[in-house]
Swiss-Prot record:
Gene Ontology biological process: conjugation with cellular fusion; establishment or maintenance of bipolar cell polarity; negative regulation of exit from mitosis; regulation of cytokinesis; regulation of formin-nucleated actin cable assembly; regulation of vesicle-mediated transport
Keywords: Coiled coil, Kelch repeat, Phosphoprotein, Repeat
Ranges where the record places region Disordered: 41-60, 480-516
Biased composition (Basic and acidic residues): 480-496
Coiled-coil residue spans: 550-685, 728-881
Other observations noted: Present with 468 molecules/cell in log phase SD medium.
Metal-binding listed as a keyword: no
Subunit structure: Interacts with KEL1.
Residue stretches of each Kelch repeat: 99-143, 153-207, 213-267, 268-317, 319-369, 371-417
UniProt modified residues of type Phosphoserine: S509
Protein name according to UniProt: Kelch repeat-containing protein 2
GO cellular component: cell cortex of cell tip; cellular bud neck; cellular bud tip; Kelch-containing formin regulatory complex; mating projection tip
Record-listed Phosphothreonine modification sites: T455
Amino acid sequence: MVPFKLTNKVPTDTGPSLISAQSVPRPIVFMDNRNNTRIVTPTLPPNQHRGISGASTALPWSPESKNTGKYIWNRVKLKNSPFPRYRHSSSFIVTNDNRIFVTGGLHDQSVYGDVWQIAANADGTSFTSKRIDIDQNTPPPRVGHASTICGNAYVVFGGDTHKLNKNGLLDDDLYLFNINSYKWTIPQPIGRRPLGRYGHKISIIASNPMQTKLYLFGGQVDETYFNDLVVFDLSSFRRPNSHWEFLEPVGDLPPPLTNHTMVAYDNKLWVFGGETPKTISNDTYRYDPAQSEWSKVKTTGEKPPPIQEHASVVYKHLMCVLGGKDTHNAYSNDVYFLNLLSLKWYKLPRMKEGIPQERSGHSLTLMKNEKLLIMGGDKTDYASPNIHDLQTSETDQGEGTLLYTLDLSSLNELCPGIMCESLHAGESFSNSLSGGFTPSKSTESENQEIINILTPRLPDSKVLSYNDIDEGAGSYSSALDDKAFERKSDREEKKPQSSKVDSSINKESPGTGIKVSKKNFPVLRGLTVDSEEYGSSSYKDTSCQKGIPKNLFDDLNLNLQTLRLEAQQKELETARHISQLEKEVQRLMVIKEASKDSNFQTARLKNLEIQKTFLESRINDLKNLLMVKLSQASKLCDQITIQNNGLKTCSEHVTIKRDIIDLENKCDVLKRQNEILVNNMQKITPELHTYLNESSCYLGKLLKSYPTSARPPSSEKDNQIYEKDSLNKIEKVINEMHETVRAKEKLHLETQKLNDERDSLRANLLDNNNKLDALRKLSDGSSKSMDLTKKAIHLSQSELEKYRKNNDDLQKEIDRIKTEQAEQDDKQEQRGAITHGNFDAFHRMKINNLKAELYMSKENRDSLKDELLALKKKLYTLEQKK
């Protein structure tokens, strides 16, 4: 691997879209042999890029505060974490099975080239992660790159990396990752490519299921900033004529930008913020592919300040912007929302509980349960070993890092009016003829987001049902459907066709249906389905492996019945169109015959009668169609009502379950307290009874001894002496009782002290066990390292023996040649001087070559000796540590 190296020479065909800025020093790459990870050593970033998340606000971590539902911010610990890393890239939305993919990024002096998969549970309260193996097509280590997800393809482009293209410039390859088969593919487009860069953004717009386009905008390379807009057709990436298209839009073009954000909504691109060559921007620009026009959006409300290195994502019809840093390198953790319909900004009220520390260079991912996931950035976010402590630590304690989630379910309450869908200044976001998706109030947020970005669909266009298509053409796929990628388009309803029919349609007999297959429809002939991928990998990661729920099976059955009705309706419509064509032909034939007989009025009357009959049949067909549609609508209403009732029941069950869990926890606490009190009472009661019994017995003895020992006083003096003795005895008894109580208290204190010492010893024992486990792991790692070192030493010794043998062979060859040369010198003394000189020159040259080979062998032998010595030293060091 070579170090980062980038020439300042830029092709002259880039035009006015390139503007100079300050250059950035280039990092150096190296290999980390310990974990087989490709790492790049860059120059140190600014101090603010390497800040530590210290005393930031956090959720309460005491065991008593278990009710975190009232917080919109929450923190989750990720044990095996790929973070911290800065200016990485991740998928902006989870997959159907709640997976997120993370690539690249920077931490301290290392640039990563690994790929991670983070999986979330259903409610987004816990996460697991695993590293994906690296293959030959995996992108090299990079930072500042851009990525997006399209169907089952995770797309990566650009970034600051050591890899150079054939012209010595930054890597300009496009990388496609199949999230099912975990394989990377590198397309090979022809013609001109966009320059490799970093700080740019890419987004997906699909005008129809057969054409998915990837848009690239902005970025920088050292002193050069970009505002060019380039598009690549992902649906044709395997075709030999696939290529990048350099657009030349009109309108109010944005300035050259880097470290901005770009999202796709309503088949348009929305660009916000970023750094220009002169300042930092907080403007919003919109690009309309249908018109190939840029426009600067005029917004209202509480607009964010100029920021860069922030993150954004689309939620319903809102563009969410989080974090970043301003012109003074002041970091932010504020959250802003732009209503893309009313073009009004809203700021999320600041709530300290659980909010992440100010950051930049992080990533933002939209989850299915109306939550945003914030990962990474310039802060370390190390987790604490205490399971209840959700504050960040300054050092890595082996417990992973913290992830942050933002709950958007109560967004309308926090920002009143934010979900308003009124259009701004008469602008319309309705569906165009080229396709697009306009969110509506009846569309669920999660599906809407997936439709707009993840797998865009064609609006109001019906795709043939299962029963209409021949076996083998059961699903649509774009050109991504092959051994590396498969992509299926969803099925939607189609508007009724008009009665105008092309005259080139072949006639069929009335009332017969047409079988729909690839042969009948050219659009199906261009589609291929990889049956192996469709049957295995595309369903490999779904939840169906655990069994299909009954309600889901019922829904699928209902949808299947609906599709069958639509297929029958399609056959009826086709037969009706054929019948219309035949009637039209009959009408024309009647007119033709009437014109021949010169009886125009009769022909006209017949024509009108035929038209009347045709219109009556058409009205009857429309009535039947209306009845079918009404029945379908009623079924859909019933289904919606059932689903709403089910959702209400589920929500009630969830609330009741939470209350039950809280009550059970409180009951457990009270039971434990009651048990402690009962145990204390049981310990104290016997002692108290014993003490009272002893006191009673002692007093009884005193009372019994008093009458027998008492004597009638003979005088007043004797009475005084007797009373004094009695008082002394009573006082002595009382003193003994006090001493007994003090001794008991002393014993109780000593018992508590011993219990505390016991708890301390247990804690020390637990710490020692943990340290022992860590030492065992270190010992295992050292043993593995020693084994690898021994293998390396053995290989080095074998190589050394090989070089020694070669050296001996060369020495023997030299001796043989010297002997032959001496013999031939004697023979050539008799020959002429010219021949003798040429022969000597030839042998001298051969001897010189052999000497050079001998010298190289000696050098290799010396280097192997040095390497062997270093390995022995390393082995000795490991043995000493062990």
